[in-house]
Design a protein with these regions (language model features):
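Extracellular beta-strand-rich, repetitive "passenger/adhesive" scaffolds
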Residues: 1-200
Length: 200
């Protein structure tokens, strides 16, 4: 196990097949045409995962961040589940597909500059901050805001948006499509639209 004073960097240009890996103080950079395939990856103690344009990461179980860790995705990222703990960040610059849930309820943050597609639930909490950039999209079945801060300049589409009764805020400057909205806290509509469904 590494310590913060001797942090290492791993560059992946080929394919890394992994089963179950927990990494401390490690920067993983997946270069163009590089791939990570496996089941489970945990990043902790300021570790980072950077996926460059043209690179892929595919995990059949989950990707977990713990203790100031960061995921920067400019390629293609696919996992069944993702967990972001306190002060962890998902920076999505291209395409992230999560086939089950994204749990940031311990204070993880999401900065979306691409397409983030979660088949089931995005869970947030009071310390969480979500930013969806112009011409970008976040899609999920259920969005549990639970007191978080949400800023939307792109498109967000959910079956259910639930503020969780914990306050929080939603600043919408573009498009929010939601069938069932349980609003609470502050909802600020600025030159945008909140509608039940998107017109074809």
């Amino acid at each position: 196990s590494l310590s913060n004073s001797n942090k290492a960097t791993v560059y992946i240009q080929g394919t890394w097949e992994l089963a179950q890996v927990t990494q401390d103080f490690l920067d993983i950079i997946v270069l163009k045409d590089g791939k990570i395939n496996g089941k489970y990856l945990m990043l902790q103690n300021t570790s980072t995962l950077t996926i460059q344009s043209g690179a892929e990461v595919s995990l059949s179980d989950q990707l977990i961040c713990n203790t100031y860790s960061t995921i920067c995705n400019f390629g293609d990222l696919k996992t069944k589940n993702m967990k972001l703990n306190t002060n962890d960040i998902l920076y999505n610059g291209h395409k992230t597909d999560i086939t089950n849930s994204l749990d940031a309820s311990q204070g993880g943050n999401i900065h979306n500059f691409g397409k983030l597609d979660v088949e089931n639930t995005i869970k947030l909490n009071t310390p969480s901050i979500v930013y969806n950039a112009p011409e970008c999209k976040i899609e999920a079945k259920t969005y549990e805001a639970a007191g978080s801060t949400n800023v939307n300049f792109g498109e967000m589409e959910f079956d259910t948006y639930d503020s969780g009764g914990a306050g929080g805020s939603l600043y919408n400057n573009c498009m929010l499509f939601v069938e069932h909205m349980k609003a609470g806290g502050i909802v600020y509509l600025d030159h945008g639209v909140i509608a039940e469904e998107k017109e074809d």
